[in-house]
Amino acid sequence: MANMNQYQNIPVEKFRFSQKTDLGHDKKFETKPVSYFQGAFRRFCKNKGAVVGGVIILVLVLFAIIAPFFTPFTPRYQDARYSYVTPKSKLFANSNLEFWDGCKIKDTNYVGYLKDLALEAETGREIIKNDKVTISEDGATYYYRYDTYYGVGFGKYKEITPEKYADIQRYQNETGRQVLYPVVKLSDRPTLEKNKYDANIYYVVEDKKAVTVRPKLDDDGNIIPNYWKYDPDDAPGTVAKYDSIRIEGDEGVPVLVTKVDENGNVVRDEKGKVVKEEKAYYYAYGIQFPSTVQVRVETYEYYIYEHTQELKDGITEPFFLFGTTGTGKDIFACLAYGARFSFIFASVVAIVNFIVGIIWGSISGYFGGKLDLAMERFCEILGSVPTMIIITLLKYHMGRFILENALYELVDIQSAIVLFISFFATGWIGIAGRTRMQFYRFKNQEYVLAARTLGASDSRIMFKHIFPNGLGTIVTSIALIIPSMIYSETSLSYLGIINLEAGNLTSVGTLINAGQEAFQTLDLNKAYVALFPCLFLVLLMLSFNLFGNGLRDAFNPSLRGSED
């Protein structure tokens, strides 16, 4: 005690002013202060996996936004004539790489091989790629790369109006593109109905009554055309008038006919034999019916004519970068539109769930007590309702309401509205639970008590002091909600529970379902139908997983300074 008094009663004269050099000062920071978000960004950039995931997500998002503007096709488009045509890129179409060139490996018998050769001979197109053919050891099967675009050939005979018949001739004369090809006389065609109107059969066949007709070859092994030839000076009334470009070899076919005089009598020589003369005959390009003209049109050129002259929809040729489905839908366009819908839908649902969940969870966790108990019981009751039941009830009852009220503009988005309500009904509960947990964790910390002591309002404490510390966990949950929503929506549309294939609306799951249908045929040439949507989904899920983990670590305040 005496010692303490001794120190307390120090005489003033014993004090001396210190030198300025003895004073201790905090060193001035040489660097600028780093904010919370700047530090989070630095930590995120040091996570290579998260950066790669973010880049992949950015590429997928840009694909969903930009790709629809670079294709004339839409999900509404479909053309059964070009079903299951393989992916084709202009970069590889004319190369010898045998990759992404619109071809597939075809295995067929000798008759099928002859039919493809016949199409090549008539149209001049390379249907058998590079003329490379492999024959099995027993000689029964032929293997070759088959062009799925040109191999469509002519399909069935078409009946068109005389006006359209004349317009096609006008188009041919202007462009020099051959759309119309010579027809075969009805009496010269195969007998069976399916073969009689098969426009690909333009040649002489061995047996007209056979189920599978076989081309008849000449002595040199060539296809024998069976076109309808007529005398232009005495054309039958059933031959439609034709005044346009003709195929090669139709410059007046020399035919030996019976010579007749001016009165129509047969001319005979001195020995009484019928005199023959050579006349120039031409091929018939249309069969005239009372109100229509029956024609043979090459599908590839007729497709171009339809879209450039009639529909004028911006489509210039049948060209599908990712191929087509069994119904003739363009996979590239459907995937782009489906991805765009998935991103927009998942983002909207995630944002709404995030806002509602944050508000609900923060109130529940901060105030606690009976209010927290009541709010938690409500969440448990609501969360116990299966999402599938909500979807089913909304699908039937809400769909009926839309149709009965004649809101036709909403019919196309009926399924999207049902999905939104279903995912929102219980989707925010998980975020609310995580937010509540974070508020319980931090609300009794010293800095929170200090802020309350200094008079900070509840809202300031909640969103200024507590919320930023729990942001890492919450943001991670948001980053994983988006792919989860996309995956759920894809699964429901894949299973057919929700139909998003209406108008210009489509889904990645619908494409995967189309791929499954293609696989049921056990044809590996159709694997591309499922390949592209599945690849998109796999990249999306993996990249969001990496991205979410990176965000969690970046927004974790306990890691502040760890990047130094």
Regions found by a protein language model. Name each.
Residues 1-46, 69-327, 564:
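Membrane-topology segments of multi-pass transport proteins
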Residues 45-50, 340:
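Short, solvent-exposed loop/edge-beta patches enriched in aromatic
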Residues 30-33, 48-51, 536, 540:
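Aromatic-acidic/polar surface patches that form glycan- and anion
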